[in-house]
Structures are given as C-alpha cells and as structure tokens.
C-alpha cells in the first residue's frame, strides 16, 4: 500500500465516522424528523452497512420512539477488516459507542449469520434473528422451464 492510500484510509476511518457517508447523517435526520411529523409511520427499518444508515435510524428512534428493526448485512466493529482501518483510540471508541447505541435502541436486530448473531448479542443487541443469505431450493421445485426465443 502506498503512503497516500494509507493516509486516505486513516482520514476516512478517523474523521468520517461511521463511514464515508457520515456527512449524510445530520441533514437526513433533520429531513426525516420533519417528514415524520407530517407522515407518521408504524416502524423504522434500516439496512447497513453503510453504518451511516444505522446511525440515522438510531437517532430517529431516540428522538421519536418509533419501533425500529435494524438489519445488518455485516457486523460493525466485528467485521473482519475493522482492524485494518488504522483507527485512533478516539475513532475506535466512537465506532463502538455508536454501535452500542444502535444495539440498545433497536427493538429488533437481524443479521445474516448465527455466529454474528452471538457476537451482536455480546455487544448489547437484543431480540436478534438470523436471516441467512441464499435461497430455499424447495421454492423452485414446482417451476416450469421458460423458453427464451430471444436468446441464443
């Protein structure tokens, strides 16, 4: 890795927390709070990464109390590349604080792996379910082949 690549990773990791979309958070929360005043909803759903989505949902949940389902396609601080982010102790603490706030605010949390489910629960996530990636072959057994005359 070049010096400039290492520097860019360090800047991104320590100044744009939780991720490169961090600048979306404040304006998104402001817009969504105004939107929700005029358009009430029964629940909030967020999907991350990017964890800026999770942070936005955390703040909306904290300010409104609307039930929230937090979906994680990958863990936050437990993801395998987290140690490669070259975080300062301040950056690491901020990531972990945001992660903990999300886990304790969410009414329901989903993740794609049973192993990660245990990791999230150890970090404070409650009411965690696993929704694995993939498909169920049983869903496709009764399908008939389709001819595609437009293909070779």
Annotate each language-model stretch with its function.
Residues 64-67, 125-127:
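A short helix->loop->beta-strand "cap" motif at the edges of active sites that frequently abuts
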Residues 27-33, 52-53, 66, 70-88, ...:
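A short, histidine- and acid-enriched strand-loop-helix "catalytic/donor-clamping" loop
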Residues 1-43, 92-96:
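Conserved nucleotide-sugar donor-binding subdomain of glycosyltransferases
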Residues 135-149:
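Acidic anion/phosphate-binding donor-loop and adjacent secondary structure
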Residues 115, 133-134:
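Carbohydrate-associated surface elements
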Residues 19, 52-55, 59-63, 76-77, ...:
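Membrane-proximal helix-turn-helix segments that form the acceptor-binding/catalytic region
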Residues 47-51:
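Short His-centered aromatic/hydrophobic patch
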